[in-house]
């Protein structure tokens, strides 16, 4: 009730009371106020004891479900499932935790954590050596060599890609149409389809 009243405010109240009431009656008034506050405190404690005596058992029975609800609220989803479905036996969930950890370990080994840093490191290592064939664009235009991409786990080699195989076949066919693979020495070669 008086928790936010400071000592300065109490001093101001005493000075005002001293002027209003007078110095002769102030000590008697302080004793009366003190006795009144003690009487109120005793009345409140007696009322609490009487209510606890009459309604104590009923109140405790009523508060048990509320306490269970609070405990369920605090335990979280895993604890709630364990308590309700598995009767508190969480040994069933440990196999899921092991499987989850195995999957996480597998994913971590497959995934490279710092792909860009590994590409930059590979690029600086390879810059001293001759550049391999580029997959798309040149190194100046931001292209990344196929070997660098495959080292980073980003791309496959050109022999595994059906698109690259088809492109190679098309470019190979165009080259064979313009120039024969071998030049025959026999006269009349190449005139078979003209008749």
From Swiss-Prot:
Biased composition (Polar residues): 127-139, 146-155
Residues annotated as signal peptide: none
One GO location term (cellular component): TAT protein transport complex
Stretches of the chain forming a coiled coil according to its record: none
Keywords: Cell membrane, Membrane, Protein transport, Translocation, Transmembrane, Transmembrane helix, Transport
GO MF annotations, alphabetized: protein transmembrane transporter activity
Membrane topology annotation: Single-pass membrane protein
Domain of life: Bacteria
Region (Disordered), start-end ranges: 103-195
Localization (cell): Cell membrane
UniProt xrefs under InterPro entries: TatB
Family membership noted in the UniProt record: Belongs to the TatB family.
Role, per record: Part of the twin-arginine translocation (Tat) system that transports large folded proteins containing a characteristic twin-arginine motif in their signal peptide across membranes. Together with TatC, TatB is part of a receptor directly interacting with Tat signal peptides. TatB may form an oligomeric binding site that transiently accommodates folded Tat precursor proteins before their translocation.
Protein name (record): Sec-independent protein translocase protein TatB
Organism: Corynebacterium jeikeium (strain K411)
Recorded name of the encoding gene: tatB
